[in-house]
């Protein structure tokens, strides 16, 4: 009887340990995810990197539809409704296999934090509150990010101001910031967010820093978001901007509208102001086909310079093979105003692309 009892306890103990191990796995998770996007593109009046040109270009480009990237995200249940969360994400140029950033391993995200019913607090490198408005309301749904005026200008990914504003790690854009603390709270249909990025400059804590706040609403087929942020460069010059947007489902069609404005001190006596208007939507043409249309208007005002800007129209036709794989064709046209593109380049530009994007 003793022998039999001992023999039963061994498998029972093994099953108990296995159950505990499974419970531990159920309380934490790590997910590998990513997007692979590559396409063939022809541009007239545009370089392969989408800048103004006097010539035409042909290229295989990465991220025409959706930016190619891979990343890790995870969470651990700490009990009492509290979770630890993290996100590491790196951009990749699929046409060459090179990292999107020459200086950062995880250029798109590198943060860790806590999440509960009151919201989440994360620390590290992450998107600004202006960028969050674009991801929620942009007419293209953040497609063609390197060519999208909402991403590049309204949300400062490519602000062309010639200085690093906020701890972005770059003088060309401030879509994401280093050394930041971010709070996001969701309460029923409403959300709020606040973010501060430390400049970490000796002798002056405000130089190279950034602060921002935002709010949003989402219910049924309606989404609205508004954010304000301010940045400083290493010399203490300021950049202040706001961005708002809204989208609505009308039947099976989606309409979206955005407007953003920012003003930057480029010297002690000079300023640059950019205003960006976006309008567009998504029209299903069948169970597997979507037509996405967007038009953007950019106006730039600079001290002691002629006002300039451009109008840009973009169209995507997408065919969904599955939830994770789709093919796309893209067409765009840009009309520059008052030499925005550079005096030696064409006054208008156009492009056509075709490619495949797969998410995992």
What are these regions (language model features)?
Residues 1-29:
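Cleavable N-terminal export/targeting peptides
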Residues 40-48, 92-98, 129-133, 200-204, ...:
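Gram-negative outer-membrane beta-barrel proteins
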Residues 71-73, 111-113, 182-184, 214-216, ...:
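Outer-membrane beta-barrel architecture
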Residues 206-314:
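Detector for outer-membrane/organellar transmembrane beta-barrel domains
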Residues 319-321, 347-360:
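Outer-membrane beta-barrel "beta-signal"
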């Amino acid at each position: 009887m003793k022998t039999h009892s001992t023999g039963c306890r061994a498998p029972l103990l093994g099953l108990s340990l296995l159950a505990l191990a499974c419970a531990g796995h159920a309380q934490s998770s790590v997910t590998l995810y990513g997007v692979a996007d590559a396409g063939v593109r022809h541009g007239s009046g545009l370089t392969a990197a989408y800048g103004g040109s006097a010539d035409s270009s042909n290229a295989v480009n990465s991220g025409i539809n959706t930016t190619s990237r891979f990343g890790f995200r995870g969470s651990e249940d700490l009990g009492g409704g509290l979770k630890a969360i993290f996100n590491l994400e790196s951009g990749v140029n699929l046409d060459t296999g090179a990292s999107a950033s020459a200086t950062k391993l995880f250029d798109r995200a590198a943060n860790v934090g806590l999440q509960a019913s009151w919201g989440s607090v994360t620390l590290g490198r992450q998107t600004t509150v202006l960028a969050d408005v674009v991801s929620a309301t942009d007419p293209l749904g953040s497609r063609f990010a390197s060519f999208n005026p909402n991403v590049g200008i309204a949300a400062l990914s490519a602000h062309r101001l010639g200085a690093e504003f906020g701890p972005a790690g770059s003088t060309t854009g401030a879509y994401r910031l280093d050394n930041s603390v971010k709070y996001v709270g969701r309460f029923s249909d409403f959300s709020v967010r606040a973010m501060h990025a430390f400049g970490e400059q000796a002798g002056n804590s405000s130089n190279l820093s950034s602060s921002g706040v935002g709010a949003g609403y989402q219910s049924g087929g309606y989404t609205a978001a508004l954010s304000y942020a301010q940045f400083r460069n290493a010399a203490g010059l300021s950049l202040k901007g706001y961005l708002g947007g809204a989208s609505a489902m009308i039947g099976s069609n989606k309409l979206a509208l955005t407007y953003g404005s920012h003003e930057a001190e480029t010297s002690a006596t000079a300023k640059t102001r950019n205003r960006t208007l976006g309008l567009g939507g998504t029209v299903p043409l069948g169970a597997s086909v979507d037509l996405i249309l967007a038009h953007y208007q950019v106006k730039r005002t600079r001290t002691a310079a002629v006002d300039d800007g451009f109008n840009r129209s973009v169209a995507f036709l997408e065919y969904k093979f599955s939830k994770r794989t789709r093919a796309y064709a893209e067409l765009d046209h840009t009309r520059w105003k008052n030499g925005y593109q550079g005096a030696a380049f064409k006054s208008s530009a156009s492009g056509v692309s075709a490619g495949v994007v797969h998410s995992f």
